[in-house]
Amino acid sequence: MVASAHMSVLTASVAGVPRIIASAPPVNGEPHPAIVAAMHMGGAHEIYVMGGIQAVGAMAIGTETIEPVHMLVGPGNAFVAEAKRQLYGRVGIDLFAGPTETMVIVDHTVDAELCATDLLGQAEHGYNSPAAMITCSEKLAQDTMIEIERILKILPTSETASASWENYGDMILCDTHEEMLGVANDMAYEHVQIMTDRDDWYLENMHSYGALFLGPRTNVANGDKVIGTNHTLPTKKAGRYTGGLWVGKFLKTHSYQRIETDEAAQLVGEYGSRLCILEGFVGHAEQCNVRVRRYGGKNIPYGEAAE
């Protein structure tokens, strides 16, 4: 996908990654010009026409002509996701991604056409893409079910979308907004559209999701493709403990220490000695003790805690 190029390549480029390589499979036996252009404009230093687990392996392990990388990011099918999972540790990855998920949280302020369109718009991703609607309006729930059937008759990708909706679709009717919020936080979906009379309340109280799309003017397609927030997002309830891909994913922190005075070496060493003995680590304690002896002038018996 063209959007995936700027979601991954451009993010790495903004982070200052010194070597960015990108790949996409051929289309009709040729490089896809729009994807290649997006990769190039996003800042890729090397572009390869390949996809699938072979591309993942080439990037992570290296080949005769491709130097291995330190991190893999970007979307793919179930095989690509599994390859990234198995390679995690050898290289870093963005996240463990499953099938895309979409949820709409709605009330009487919107109509069935919007709800059905937004549910099916993401259900066409694949036959196993979950789509859920949470509402406190029974009429809207019934009308949306009817509208889904109508749209499936004219949607070119209806074979895929209908399979997703039939096998992974949920229509959840709640009594209150508080109950809707609780269900949504528990499900922790990737994409969550909120179209209610209290969108900001949901923004303040939602805590488990990939990305929120607030108000009827906003939708997942615009968010994933155009608005600018990253569409590499957590699925399968991973939104409970992590967020999506961002510039910080390509950055890492390091620490260093230096003790510069004899007094500091003695003070820190005495604390360290006592703590290490308390934990049962004599070897650790002696790292502290030897410095207390040298820089503090104290004669601490071997293997004992400093006073």
Regions found by a protein language model. Give the residues of each.
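Conserved small-residue-rich beta-alpha loop and adjacent elements
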Residues: 1-37
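Conserved NAD(P)+-binding/catalytic subdomain of aldehyde/semialdehyde dehydrogenases
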Residues: 41-130
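Short, well-ordered beta-strand elements within core beta-sheets of diverse protein domains
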Residues: 102-107, 133, 167-175, 188-194, ...
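Glycine-rich, Lys/Arg-enriched anion-binding loops that position phosphate/diphosphate groups
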Residues: 152-198
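C-terminal core of ALDH-fold dehydrogenases
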Residues: 177, 185-307
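A conserved active-site cap/scaffold subdomain adjacent to cofactor or substrate pockets
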Residues: 95-167, 171
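Short acidic loop-to-helix transition motifs that present clustered carboxylates
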Residues: 27-31, 50-58, 199
